[in-house]
UniProtKB/Swiss-Prot annotation:
Residues 9-20 have a biased composition (Basic residues). GO terms for cellular component: cytosol; small ribosomal subunit. Residues 1-27 are annotated as: Disordered. Gene3D superfamilies: Ribosomal protein S20. One of its GO terms (molecular function) is structural constituent of ribosome. InterPro entries: Ribosomal_bS20, Ribosomal_bS20_sf. Keywords: Ribonucleoprotein, Ribosomal protein, RNA-binding, rRNA-binding. SUPFAM superfamilies: Ribosomal protein S20. Belongs to the bacterial ribosomal protein bS20 family. PANTHER family: 30S RIBOSOMAL PROTEIN S20, SMALL RIBOSOMAL SUBUNIT PROTEIN BS20C. This is Small ribosomal subunit protein bS20. HAMAP family: Ribosomal_bS20 (MF_00500).
Length: 87
């Protein structure tokens, strides 16, 4: 456990950041799931619109360091391939 005022404060901040980041990751996953559900339903227009939102969300998370930039690129590539395969 934290033995100094500084360590206590850092522990508080770390927990606050952890909870914030978890919420951000969950929101990102939700945007990706919306795209995949639109693809499963066969609605290309909805999938394309949802992909724009998901792409922005993935890039944002990569920029902030919540996910690796390669993971963001890989996810965008795979989702886009699934949308293109619908045609």
């Amino acid at each position: 456990m934290a033995n100094s005022v500084q360590a206590t404060k850092r522990a508080r901040q770390a927990e606050k950041h952890r909870q914030h980041n978890a919420g951000m990751r969950a929101a990102m996953r939700t945007t990706v799931k919306k795209v995949l559900s639109a693809v499963e339903a066969g609605d290309k227009e909805a999938a394309t619109a949802a992909f724009r939102v998901a792409q922005s969300s993935l890039d944002n998370m990569a920029r902030k360091g919540l996910i690796a930039k390669n993971k963001a690129a890989r996810n965008k590539s795979r989702i886009n391939a699934r949308i293109k395969a619908m045609a």
